[in-house]
């Protein structure tokens, strides 16, 4: 053994060939600050070996390196810029030393080589992968860009076009795709990976492979003539602006950095990369996007903890077909849980099966399933007009019309037919679970399971705990949601639960703004382009359905009359009274026609302005700041109330529910991250300017207390490790 640390080992293989093995404690290798330092120490030893002829780099795990340790990121980002710059120079010096070894080097890639793992293999002369390997640089998805030379070496290895695609999108590539673009030199069976890498290394040592020629382009300027460069980078910048937009600066910064570095060799190009990385790391967007990654890990860990030891059901049932029931049945069947789909109406069953077939057809067109697989998945959905076999289902999801009497009757009816351990869940969006539980003899076996539409796309499932819901019931439903590929978040019961409870104050703020003369076109534009929502409130109402929103609005007003009751007709009332229900009937705030692909195309409708004039002040232009404040303050206040009342258990779960359930702009990180970015005191001061508008704008006491004590919702990350001593700075 030449060198050994907690995360890697260096030893001789044979005849002057050394092997560097990444083998950290735990299930995966990460390129954390400690491992980077350990790599430097291993190179110290290696550089002194006069008999060294070659180096093979591999992993003892099922993946090479899954990336940097993202739990360290916020600490790094909170460091003074000069400290972060110093650490990046330190790290890049180590990767340069790996690249500059006076012998050929090769990486054997099994599983993932992402982020810093990808940058590490780029520093070797050759790369060989097993078929399941995936390689990529996902940093731009986290609001940053490669920082260990990825933006320098990848373009020089692959050419600018392929490198820009990988870096700007943050997507990883398969081993076979990596072979096609020149990212790896060979793909071999897993059992032959190390042997083949050793053979290739020996060929390089014997002069049969020119390892110096493989290394040379990575040290030199990018080989592009001025015309090619202008075309390549102009197209890339245009594409990035179109896809990422102004709220996600990292992809464009990466493209511009690669462009600026193209004419330089490695040293100057790395300096440019570091100089671009540091400001990105200090940005609010990076903190928010890294925060989302960490919150996602936390939420998934909570789900795993809740459902520990509980298997997903072998058979499920959905009561109520149609689009929603069909979507739930499809998702269940797709993820290998057979499902009974029951309805009282043959047409609804046909609609549900057609929905499942349509979604599977899309999978077929994309090559995700073949015809045989599609048929076998569809065969696991059993449509039925009666309850035959329902007693065999372990979890039953009620998804009938959003009417408390109908839901209660259906739940009571099915409960009489099933065993004492069968779990019942209601896919209600607003009706309190405790209200529905009154019709049941075994309320401990009952909870809410709120899917979002469209089911196959929306990652969130709200699991609603009623007053009598047992832990066993929650565990079973969380296990089912997880098996379905969803992110379950447990919330406590109240009208609207969490997501809809906080959505309707936002829509109420919109309604008041329109009442006071706001133009809904301008409001939508500001909330989409400036704040970053995928769709503005008027467009969202059309997509949700004006009739659905009108009904939910009444439920919320009854549940929270002190804030959500209103004594005036609003825009939703006007649309509803005029039977403008949104996309479902082709007219709402906007008019909808079908495009060539059969998707709804939004168009302006002058008739709407005339209808809204009945309930609005004369049109006036509000500032972007006013529009954002008047719509967002009610939502933010309600989100905070939900945490203070224990409806949600943590800021992390609240923020993930908003991002996954409502499409809250990820670059803000969720309401709690947004508040931490603004500063609680700044937010309270802003909200007070709108307090005259009513109770929805009154800041909750807990948030006022945080403002007074200068507290945040998320803990402040500790300082960056000092690069020379590995101790907190």
Curated annotation (Swiss-Prot):
Pathway: Lipid metabolism; fatty acid beta-oxidation. Its EC number is 4.2.1.17, 5.1.2.3, 5.3.3.8, 1.1.1.35. Substrate binds at residues 296, 500, 660. Keywords: Fatty acid metabolism, Isomerase, Lipid degradation, Lipid metabolism, Lyase, Multifunctional enzyme, NAD, Oxidoreductase. It comes from the Bacteria. Involved in the aerobic and anaerobic degradation of long-chain fatty acids via beta-oxidation cycle. Catalyzes the formation of 3-oxoacyl-CoA from enoyl-CoA via L-3-hydroxyacyl-CoA. It can also use D-3-hydroxyacyl-CoA and cis-3-enoyl-CoA as substrate. GO terms for cellular component: fatty acid beta-oxidation multienzyme complex. The gene is fadB. Heterotetramer of two alpha chains (FadB) and two beta chains (FadA). This is Fatty acid oxidation complex subunit alpha. In the N-terminal section; belongs to the enoyl-CoA hydratase/isomerase family. Residues 311-729 are annotated as: 3-hydroxyacyl-CoA dehydrogenase. NCBIfam families: FadB, PRK11730.1. GO terms for molecular function: 3-hydroxybutyryl-CoA epimerase activity; delta(3)-delta(2)-enoyl-CoA isomerase activity; enoyl-CoA hydratase activity; long-chain-3-hydroxyacyl-CoA dehydrogenase activity; NAD+ binding.
């Amino acid at each position: 053994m030449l060198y050994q640390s907690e995360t890697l080992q260096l030893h001789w293989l044979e005849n002057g060939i050394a092997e560097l093995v990444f083998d950290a404690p735990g299930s995966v290798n990460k390129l954390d600050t400690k491992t980077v330092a350990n790599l430097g120490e291993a190179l110290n030893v290696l550089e002194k070996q006069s008999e060294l002829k070659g180096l093979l780099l591999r992993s003892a795990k099922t993946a090479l390196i899954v990336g940097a340790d993202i739990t360290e990121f916020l600490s790094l980002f909170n460091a003074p810029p000069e400290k972060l710059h110093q650490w990046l120079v330190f790290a890049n010096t180590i990767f340069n030393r790996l690249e500059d070894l006076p012998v050929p080097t090769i990486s054997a890639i099994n599983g993932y080589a992402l982020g810093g793992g990808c940058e590490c293999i780029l520093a070797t002369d050759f790369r060989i992968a097993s078929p399941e390997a995936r390689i990529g640089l996902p940093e731009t998805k986290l609001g940053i860009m490669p920082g260990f030379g990825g933006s320098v070496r990848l373009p020089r290895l692959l050419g600018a076009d392929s490198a820009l695609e990988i870096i700007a999108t943050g997507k990883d590539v398969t081993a076979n795709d990596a072979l096609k673009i020149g990212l790896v030199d060979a793909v071999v069976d897993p059992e032959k990976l190390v042997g083949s890498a050793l053979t290739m290394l020996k060929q390089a040592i014997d002069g049969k492979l020119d390892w110096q020629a493989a290394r040379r382009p990575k040290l030199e300027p990018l080989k592009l003539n001025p015309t090619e460069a202008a075309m390549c980078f102009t197209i890339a910048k245009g594409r990035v602006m179109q896809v990422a937009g102004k709220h996600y600066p990292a992809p464009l910064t990466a493209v511009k950095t690669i462009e600026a570095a193209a004419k330089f060799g490695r040293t100057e190009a790395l300096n440019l990369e570091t100089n671009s990385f540091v400001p990105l790391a200090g940005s609010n967007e990076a903190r928010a996007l890294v925060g989302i990654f960490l919150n996602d890990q936390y939420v998934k860990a909570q789900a795993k903890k809740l459902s520990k030891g509980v298997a997903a059901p072998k058979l499920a049932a959905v009561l109520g077909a149609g689009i929603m029931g069909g979507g739930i049945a499809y998702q269940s069947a797709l993820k290998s849980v057979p499902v009974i789909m029951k309805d009282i109406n043959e047409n609804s069953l046909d609609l549900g099966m057609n929905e499942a077939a349509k979604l599977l057809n899309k999978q077929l067109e994309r090559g995700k399933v073949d015809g045989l697989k599609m048929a076998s998945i569809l065969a696991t959905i059993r449509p039925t007009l009666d309850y035959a076999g329902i007693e065999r289902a372990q979890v039953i999801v009620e998804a009938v019309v959003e009417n408390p009497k109908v839901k209660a009757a259906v739940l009571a009816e099915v409960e009489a037919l099933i065993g004492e351990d069968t779990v019942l869940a209601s896919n209600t969006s607003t009706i309190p679970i405790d209200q529905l539980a009154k019709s049941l003899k075994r309320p401990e076996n009952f909870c809410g399971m709120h899917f979002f539409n469209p089911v196959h796309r929306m990652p969130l499932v709200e699991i609603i705990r009623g007053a009598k819901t047992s832990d066993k019931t929650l565990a079973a439903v969380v296990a089912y949601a997880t098996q379905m590929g969803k992110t379950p978040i447990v919330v406590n019961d109240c009208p609207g639960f969490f997501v809809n409870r906080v959505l309707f104050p936002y829509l109420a703020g919109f309604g008041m703004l329109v009442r006071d003369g706001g133009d809904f076109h301008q409001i939508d534009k500001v909330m989409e382009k400036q704040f970053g929502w995928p769709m503005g409130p008027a467009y969202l109402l059309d997509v949700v359905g004006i009739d659905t929103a009108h009904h939910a609005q009444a439920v919320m007003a009854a549940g929270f009359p002190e804030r959500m009751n209103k004594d005036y007709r609003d825009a939703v009332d006007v649309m509803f009274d005029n039977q403008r229900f949104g996309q479902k009937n082709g007219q709402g705030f906007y008019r909808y026609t079908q495009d060539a692909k059969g998707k709804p195309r939004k168009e302006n409708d002058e008739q709407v302005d005339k209808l809204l004039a009945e309930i609005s002040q004369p049109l006036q232009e509000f500032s972007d700041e006013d529009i954002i404040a008047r719509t967002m303050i009610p939502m933010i206040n309600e989100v905070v109330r939900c945490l203070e009342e224990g409806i949600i258990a943590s800021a992390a779960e609240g923020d993930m529910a908003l991002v996954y359930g409502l499409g809250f702009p990820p670059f803000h990180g969720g309401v709690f991250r947004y508040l931490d970015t603004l500063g609680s005191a700044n937010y309270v001061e802003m909200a007070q300017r709108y307090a005259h508008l009513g109770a929805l704008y009154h800041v909750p006491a807990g948030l006022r207390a945080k403002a007074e004590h200068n507290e945040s919702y998320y803990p402040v990350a500790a300082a960056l490790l000092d690069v020379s001593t590995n101790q907190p700075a």
